[in-house]
Amino acid sequence: MLSVPDYEFWFVTGSQHLYGEEQLKSVAKDAQDIADKLNASGKLPYKVVFKDVMTTAESITNFMKEVNYNDKVAGVITWMHTFSPAKNWIRGTELLQKPLLHLATQYLNNIPYADIDFDYMNLNQSAHGDREYAYINARLQKHNKIVYGYWGDEDVQEQIARWEDVAVAYNESFKVKVARFGDTMRNVAVTEGDKVEAQIKMGWTVDYYGIGDLVEEINKVSDADVDKEYADLESRYEMVQGDNDADTYKHSVRVQLAQYLGIKRFLERGGYTAFTTNFEDLWGMEQLPGLASQLLIRDGYGFGAEGDWKTAALGRVMKIMSHNKQTAFMEDYTLDLRHGHEAILGSHMLEVDPSIASDKPRVEVHPLDIGGKDDPARLVFTGSEGEAIDVTVADFRDGFKMISYAVDANKPEAETPNLPVAKQLWTPKMGLKKGALEWMQAGGGHHTMLSFSLTEEQMEDYATMVGMTKAFLK
């Protein structure tokens, strides 16, 4: 399984020396208490570390520099306990190269009417301190996240948690490396894109390799290594021989397992975290990678079919963000246009992620007309029910655009005995007709990432962080 470093977030609160040392000690004590209780809540995926009370431009600037150069730190969380003159934040905020969350909160969640005096008022000035601070971020066009509300409330903690996942994905985005095995499908438009701009904006490195390089690695895989993977497959999934004889079935599965290990070793050696295949580029391969691709996707690798490196990179980012939970490569395949039944049946030839399965996936072997190779093994399953999002990235002359809408996912209304692939049914929440029209008008492609565990807000936050144009359809 691809791992993500154990990041942390540094938390600072703003104030000024005007209030005196005793008040500043109280500010630090309260901020430390907030950090401790956020960590103890069990809601946050990454630790919050309180660093200091920021009172001068010099200290803020030095702090932001330290954040930039500490690889363990994924971002900054700020809070204005008292009034903090925002000119002090200008230089440091301009220098900050990592995600910024402004937590607009207050240490206590009430007004102590019976006891309140001006000492209390001076100490608890978040109401206008946060506005002063928010102004300078808006003036600097920092496009930071603001979470508003009482820090001890579950909904606020959940917002912070979701943002932490996005911020970590942003940091990891600059480590995303896509290995393209073969080129994009010939004459297809939407899978093309500016790889240099993708590396500048999102940090995605995209490299091409000829199929011969990959075949050489696959051929090195030993029978003993395949035996181990076969046993693991038997322990995880249902092995369905179907109409195949035993030897044919087992050989087909073993070919895919050799591909899985060969591709994985190739990716590991080059530090790649995503990959693409293309059924038009299969020189020297017995089968189109089906089960092989699904197992790699299961392990956290991003994937794009037909050379679609943008979806492969997006998939890796979303898998980081979702902790590799219920987030799958998908393609709009066929439609139900009957009134009252409007839906999209999503699938792909072979490569849908088993993380969205509602039943135990079955390892099956069936013919595949496309590609001109032997019958490939694949995982067959039905997707899940619930709320999800469908997301794609397209490249236009003026830059990249993220297009997304919320969907209601369902299971097919009937069995599909002649369709031995993984499949997922869904309908845009805005309606199929309106959703499809607006998707096409925005230039959204047919390859997407479908996620049951991420929110549109998270994807919008990521798009904002990397400076991507957004078309979130409502």
Swiss-Prot record:
GO cellular component, alphabetical, reads:
cytosol
Cofactor: how and how many bound: Binds 1 Mn(2+) ion per subunit.
Instruction: Quickly give the catalysed reaction.
Output: beta-L-arabinopyranose = L-ribulose
Q: Name one Pfam family in it.
A: Arabinose_Iso_C
Q: Which domain of life is it from?
A: Bacteria
Q: Which cofactor does it need?
A: Mn(2+)
Q: What is its EC number?
A: 5.3.1.4
Q: Which residues bind Mn(2+)?
A: 306, 331, 348, 447
Keyword terms of this UniProt record: Arabinose catabolism, Carbohydrate metabolism, Isomerase, Manganese, Metal-binding
What is any one GO biological process for this UniProt entry? L-arabinose catabolic process to xylulose 5-phosphate
What pathway annotation does it carry? Carbohydrate degradation; L-arabinose degradation via L-ribulose; D-xylulose 5-phosphate from L-arabinose (bacterial route): step 1/3
Matches recorded under Gene3D superfamilies: 3.40.50.10940
One GO molecular-function entry: L-arabinose isomerase activity
Q: Which family does it belong to?
A: Belongs to the arabinose isomerase family.
Briefly, what is this protein's role?
A: Catalyzes the conversion of L-arabinose to L-ribulose.
Q: What is this protein called?
A: L-arabinose isomerase
Q: Which organism is it from?
A: Lactiplantibacillus plantarum (strain ATCC BAA-793 / NCIMB 8826 / WCFS1)
